[in-house]
């Protein structure tokens, strides 16, 4: 299945050629970057529907659940025997079809930008042009650690969202240049999410983790 190959996207110019950016534009970019960090940090819990698409055009949906600090769950739609979940320390990919479990430190995944925005977005983020005042796009890349991949977070300005920006999608590019795009809808914030929502049934044993 193609999405097994693209999981790493979720879980793992020379100065002379650079464009000259005006001081007001730099100030606006700094404000947007700070707003994005504030918006992500303001999300205590969130649930949303998601659509995940890869470069081959394959799409699959499901429900995303997030809880700070560091917990996230991608529950795929019925018929997709996979699960992505973080318990706050490691990101786990569970493939129930082949009874396999893989784990990564969350900081080694592009998703670390979602779960630790102060460290990743604030330090490594840069504002990208969008052509719309309503859209803010932040590319997060640690150039010293290319194996961590790149994630581009896209926000829509919305007064009712935490921090005034609603996370609407992101594109993750892993170190093998595999790209995955995740689009969110029906976002709900501040909902009750128990910690056991981030446990999973280990297909290798009868033990629930």
Task: Enumerate the predicted regions with their spans.
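Extracytoplasmic
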Residues: 43-45, 59-61, 67-69, 79, ...
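A short, Trp-centered hydrophobic/proline-enriched beta-strand micro-motif
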Residues: 38-57
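Cleaved targeting-peptide boundary
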Residues: 26-34
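Gly/Pro-enriched, hydrophobic low-complexity segments
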Residues: 122-124, 129-209
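An acidic-aromatic
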Residues: 63-115, 180-183
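Bacterial N-terminal signal peptides that target proteins for export
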Residues: 1-14
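N-terminal signal peptide c-region/cleavage motif recognized by signal peptidases
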Residues: 20-24
